Amino acid sequence: GWGAAHILSKQGLGGKIPLSRLLADAIHYAEAGVPVTYSQSSLTAKKREELSPIPGFAKTFLVNGKAPTVGSIFKQERLAKTLRQIAEKGTNDYYRGDLAQLLAKELTDIGSPLRLDDLRRHRAKLIDPLELKHRLGKVYNMIPPTQGVVSLMIIGILDQLNLKRFKVDSAE
């Protein structure tokens, strides 16, 4: 879908930023790493036993078999390599190129029913998003099967409540 969005941006909206630039920050942070947050550390520790049998989980998310510590640097070199290849070869490589072949092989190796042909048949669809008219402007979100409807309902309800009349941290 991101490839179709990038093309739409360039052709229909006058977008000028190349894919390589759009992915540059993600590549940087995947390579250089980001500080591990409390929630990442605690949830990884909590779910470690359940998730460890999943192929690739321990190698990607654990440090010496344990959850990473808060403040340590979490790097994702394989993600950086994948994003760099997408930046160089285009998003189509993920579904129909070298990345697709690698992904299909790894999926087969772990017993997934997805095959290379499934990836090759994938096509993004352009759809009209959900829209909510808000007093501050329009808010957009995705159609089901996402939580888009619920999030727009919450925003709409909050818009009607006039929250400015409440004090911060009040019981109301």
Across the structure, where does each feature detected by a protein language model lie?
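Feature marks proteins synthesized as precursors that undergo proteolytic processing into two chains
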Residues: 1-172
